[in-house]
Amino acid sequence: MVQVSFEDFFKVPDLKFDISRLRKDLEVILEKKNFNSLGISHFGAIPINRIPNDNDSVEGHNVRGKYWTIADETGKVVSRDIAIDESKYTELMPEFENTYFKEVYETLKSKFKLGRVRLLLKEPRSTLSWHKDPEPRLHIPIITNKGCSMAVSYTHLRAHETSID
C-alpha cells in the first residue's frame, strides 16, 4: 500500500468544526434552498455569502466563477467562466443566520481573508476534471461516500477519512 504524506498541507492549530452539526443544519438549509445547477451536470451550489445587498452576486455564473482547465487533447490550459472579485463577498446570506454555518463562517473570517463561501454538491459517481482556482480554497466534506477522494497538487485525500480536527 502506498503511504500518503500530507506534510505540504497547511493545518491551522486549534481549528475544529463539528461535522454532525453541519449535517444537521444542512438539512435546515435544504428545506429553504435548492442547489443551483446552472444547467451543469452533476454540479450544484448554494451561496453562503454575497456582496452586501447584491442578490445578483449569487446568481448565474457568479455562483461558479473563473477557473482554468485543460479543455482538450492539446494540453493547453485555458480560462473558463467570468472573473469575480471575491473580496467583496462579505455578507452572510439571511438563511444561514442562526445556523452552525454562521459560526463556522465567523470563525474562518476571524482567521483568514475570505472570498465566496458556498455549499457545493457533487453527485455520486461524478467527478470534476483537473482545474485551478484563482484563489486558495478550503474544502470541508459534510456528506460524502466511501471511496470519494480529492487530488490537490497531485496528492490524493480520502474525503470520508479526513477530519477538520
Residue ranges of model-derived segments:
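Non-heme Fe(II)/2-oxoglutarate
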Residues: 1-104
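Acidic-glycine-rich active-site phosphate/pyrophosphate-binding loop
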Residues: 114
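Conserved short histidine dyad/triad with adjacent acidic residue
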Residues: 118-131
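Short, conserved beta-strand element in jelly-roll/cupin
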Residues: 133-147
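Short aromatic-centered micro-motifs
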Residues: 150
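Conserved small/polar residues in nucleotide/adenosyl-binding loops
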Residues: 155-162
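Gly/Pro- and small hydrophobic-enriched strand-loop and loop-to-helix capping segments
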Residues: 165
